[in-house]
Regions:
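An acidic, charge-biased composition feature
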Residues: 1-93
């Protein structure tokens, strides 16, 4: 899972996509919201949107202070890779 970062207006923006079966998007979105709530004090903004372009996936964006960039990167990697390993998506449309 590749994370992209943009620095703008004194904030860091972390953007990544999680490719997951559309039938299980509810489960993945619940996990994204759970992650956001767990670390809400670190975030300024959170956006999630759904796409089927180039495969079924949810795109996620978090905004936070630049000094938290390394911590967020590690937490996103750890959290969502664990989720994908424990609950792989196996059913396309």
């Amino acid at each position: 899972m590749k994370q992209n970062y943009t620095l703008m207006g004194g904030k860091a923006w972390c953007c990544f996509s999680v490719f997951y079966s559309r039938k299980a998007w509810g489960s993945l979105l619940t996990e994204v919201v759970s992650f956001y709530r767990e670390f809400q004090s670190l975030f300024h903004y959170f956006v999630a949107y759904f796409s089927e372009q180039q495969g079924e996936h949810i795109k996620v964006t978090f905004s936070f202070d630049i000094e938290n960039m390394v911590e967020i990167q590690e937490r996103v990697d750890t959290h969502f890779l664990l989720f994908l390993n424990q609950k792989p998506s196996v059913h396309p449309k």
